[in-house]
Design a protein with these regions (language model features):
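Conserved Rossmann-fold cofactor-binding substructure of NAD(P)-dependent oxidoreductases
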Residues: 43-64
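NAD(P)-cofactor binding segment of oxidoreductase domains
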Residues: 61-105
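Conserved Rossmann-fold NAD(P)-dependent oxidoreductase catalytic core, especially the SDR/UDP-sugar
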Residues: 90-132
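Catalytic helix-loop patch of NAD(P)-dependent Rossmann-fold dehydrogenases
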Residues: 116-157
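Glycine/proline-rich active-site loop of Rossmann-fold NAD(P)-dependent oxidoreductases
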Residues: 137-140, 151-152, 164-173, 183, ...
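A conserved pocket-lining segment of Rossmann-fold NAD(P)-dependent short-chain dehydrogenase/reductase
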Residues: 173-193, 197
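Mid/C-terminal beta-alpha module of Rossmann-like enzyme folds, strongest
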Residues: 201, 208-258
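C-terminal amphipathic/interface module of NAD(P)-dependent oxidoreductases
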Residues: 260-296
Length: 296
């Protein structure tokens, strides 16, 4: 198994996969991130820019599974394109000379532009890229290129919701610091997924004896919830005032997610991936996941 972009999710995946018997190789542009994965020996840690070809000769085939968990390299939309488009293209060039059986790419639910709170499935991505946010357009192009690239005999895209878990506490840290105003629209739905449930989903996909034709699947928990509901529940548990939301405070990163001046607001359905793999999130809603974090 090769894990590209081995950061927050990748480190957890590497730990579980290594214990499960996989020979794991890990890649990141951040040496400190790789050093934290003690179960992977130094000779199997590759520090490099993914979009560069400089790392290609460090990894030889055959490879049972290549998983790209890369996140944006920063620098706005240009960083998005560098990470998600050029990074995947670099992996494809590398795979042309190696026997790579399976490729998994983690995209995001930002490819869904709906703003009306409706429930969406994998079929609800608009045909016209101009209907997507700038970030969504880049991710959708990356998805399309991967699904069409036959250099990988089997390929799959997982669209992840907002990631949280140990050390990554959406809203929780803000409330603990005493912040009482949060950027955004409180009535908009959040589609979350716990880090450990992502790891379980990736391994569930790899356990399938045969993959279906190339396709995208949503990996989110079972119960999308309004932002204000999540924040209020956390505030109650912490014993602090319930914060209010202010859309005018949205930063540049949030503005790149807007569609037609509005923030995304939809409830993402995970039924297709559950039916395919039998995966069930251990944390089916935000309460389950955050209760564990609060108790920890």
């Amino acid at each position: 198994m090769v894990i590209f972009g081995c950061g927050y999710v990748g480190r957890a995946l590497a730990e579980v996969a290594a214990v499960s018997g996989w020979e794991v190789w890990i890649h990141s542009r951040n040496a400190e991130s790789l050093a934290a994965v003690g179960v992977v020996p130094p000779e199997r840690r590759i520090v490099a820019d993914l979009h560069s070809d400089a790392w290609h000769d460090r990894l030889h085939g055959p490879v049972e599974a290549a998983i790209n968990l890369v996140s944006s390299a920063g620098n706005g939309l240009e960083g998005y394109e560098l990470s998600y488009l050029e990074g995947n293209r670099s992996i494809a060039r590398w795979a042309e000379k190696r026997a790579v059986r399976r490729f998994l790419f983690t995209s995001a639910t930002s490819v869904y532009p709906q703003t009306d709170g409706s429930r969406v499935t994998e079929a609800d991505v608009p045909a016209d890229p101009e209907d997507l946010s700038p970030n969504g357009r880049v991710l959708r192009q990356a998805e399309t290129e991967i699904l069409a690239n036959t250099v990988f005999p089997e390929r799959m895209v997982l669209r992840l919701g907002g990631i949280y878990g140990p050390g990554r506490h959406l809203y929780l840290d803000r409330l603990r610091k005493g912040e009482n105003v949060i950027p955004g629209e409180g009535g908009d739905f959040l589609n979350l997924v716990h880090r450990d449930d992502i790891v379980a989903a990736l391994l569930a996909a790899l356990r399938l004896r045969k993959w279906p034709p190339p396709a995208c699947y949503n990996v989110v928990d079972d119960a999308p919830a309004p932002k204000a509901e999540i924040a209020a529940w956390l505030a109650q548990r912490l014993g602090v005032p319930v914060p209010r939301f202010d859309p005018a405070l949205a930063g540049r990163r949030s503005r790149r997610r807007r569609i037609g001046g509005r923030f995304p607001n939809r409830r993402v359905d995970n039924g297709a991936f559950r039916d395919l793999t039998g995966w069930e999130p251990r944390h089916p809603d935000f309460r389950s996941g955050y209760q564990e974090l609060l108790e920890g």
